[in-house]
């Protein structure tokens, strides 16, 4: 695989994840402008995550019979137009509609990217390739949030989405220059391809861990802006967006995941350590201080994204056949967790408060630790 093509794939990943998470730090602002409740504002995240929860499996299956590059070109173009539509929307209904259609495009792009990597990178290097992919999606989430907060504070929130649309247009041009993924199998699409993957107990457990960590993490990220407004109503969108700076630690941990796995003595132990850090930071996030939350987010993001990088890389090593399907299923499962987490725990937050909310999420993370200890491969 050409280094240039890897760079194009990673830049596209950054732009796509920026498009997903850009609204998150400005949810209180959007809720105020459109007269929404906390849960109504959170639905702007659920709307894009819900299609992500079931569409990736279909796209993963389709990629066993279609070139990933072709799907990338079609869906990147559509996503760019939908970002511009979100920026121009004048009603809550149009915002939700644009987000739903964005959610239909994003999983196609992500499944195409992971499949492109899986089929064009040598098996010996797939773990490292996937950790760089995870690092790119973390960077994209961070860039999208900070860009959104800064632009909303200084120029108006709509310009964020016009800028993202332009970035995606640039990605479209870059993808046209990528080498075709000729090694993809042109087999027929069969849903039965899913069952052999799920029969692998270790892969099934990795899927369960992915569901749980994204459920807890997305819940925290979605409702954190509202919590910060409770702590200090004077916080601007940019100040709130900077609370996501901990994502930078997630990049470091993901890129270094392969080396850290060796230091920990294997994937299972490494994932357990990451989950424990994630759980402890979820308890500490109760501190009623913006500065404290800022610091804790570095630990939380480092632990969570390390677990994600290890789980995804390990799953690709264990999936000896139909990797596009395995990746599509992984994306589907963890975004199912994210979609549920972006709304359901908010009911606890609204009715019982922040402490009950974070305790519930900590209990979910503890469940992921139990699942991880049941993994049968070495380490």
Language-model segments: what does each one mean?
Residues 35, 67, 88-94, 105, ...:
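Helix-breaking motifs and short loop linkers at transmembrane-helix boundaries and internal kinks
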Residues 54-91:
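Conserved MFS/SLC helix-loop-helix module at the cytosolic interface between two early adjacent transmembrane helices
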Residues 55-67, 253-266, 349:
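Helix-to-loop junctions at the C-terminal end of transmembrane segments
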Residues 78, 82, 93-102, 291-299:
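Paired small-residue
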Residues 98-137:
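Cytoplasmic helix-loop-helix junction between adjacent transmembrane helices
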Residues 123-177:
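Helix-loop-helix hairpin linking two adjacent transmembrane segments in secondary transporters
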Residues 178-207:
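Juxtamembrane intracellular "pre-TM" segments in multi-pass secondary transporters
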Residues 267-311:
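C-terminal transmembrane helical hairpin of 12-TM major facilitator-type secondary transporters
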């Amino acid at each position: 695989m050409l280094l240039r093509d890897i760079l194009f794939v990673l830049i596209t990943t950054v732009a796509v994840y920026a498009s997903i998470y850009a609204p998150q730090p400005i949810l209180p602002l959007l809720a105020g402008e459109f007269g929404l409740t906390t849960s109504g504002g959170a639905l702007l995240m659920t709307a894009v995550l819900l299609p992500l929860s079931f569409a990736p499996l279909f796209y993963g299956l389709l990629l066993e019979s279609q070139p990933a590059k072709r799907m990338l070109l079609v869906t990147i173009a559509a996503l760019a137009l939908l970002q511009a539509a979100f920026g121009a929307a004048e009603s809550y209904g149009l915002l939700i509609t644009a987000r739903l259609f964005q959610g239909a495009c994003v999983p196609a792009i992500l499944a195409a990217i992971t499949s492109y990597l899986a089929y064009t990178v040598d098996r010996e290097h797939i773990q490292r390739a996937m950790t760089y992919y995870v690092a790119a999606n973390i960077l994209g989430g961070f860039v999208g949030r900070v860009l959104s907060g800064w632009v909303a504070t200084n120029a108006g929130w709509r310009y964020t989405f016009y800028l993202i649309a332009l970035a995606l247009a640039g990605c479209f041009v870059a993808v046209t220059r990528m080498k075709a993924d000729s090694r993809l199998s042109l087999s027929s699409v069969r849903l039965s391809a899913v069952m052999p993957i799920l029969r692998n107990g270790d892969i099934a457990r990795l899927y369960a861990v992915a569901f749980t960590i994204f459920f807890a993490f997305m819940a925290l990220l979605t409702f954190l802006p509202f919590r910060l407004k409770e702590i200090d109503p004077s916080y601007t969108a940019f100040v709130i967006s900077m609370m996501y700076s901990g994502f930078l630690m997630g990049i470091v941990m993901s890129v270094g995941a392969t080396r850290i796995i060796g230091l920990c003595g294997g994937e299972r132990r490494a994932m357990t350590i990451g989950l424990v850090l994630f759980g402890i930071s979820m308890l500490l996030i109760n501190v009623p201080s913006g500065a404290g939350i800022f610091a804790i987010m570095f630990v939380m993001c480092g632990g969570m994204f390390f677990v994600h990088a290890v789980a995804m890389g390990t799953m690709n090593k264990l999936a000896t056949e139909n990797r596009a399907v395995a990746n599509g299923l992984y994306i589907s499962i963890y975004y199912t967790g994210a979609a549920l987490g972006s709304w359901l725990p908010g009911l606890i937050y609204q009715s019982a408060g922040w402490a009950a909310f974070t305790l519930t999420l900590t209990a979910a993370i503890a469940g992921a630790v139990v699942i991880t200890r049941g993994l049968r491969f070495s380490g």
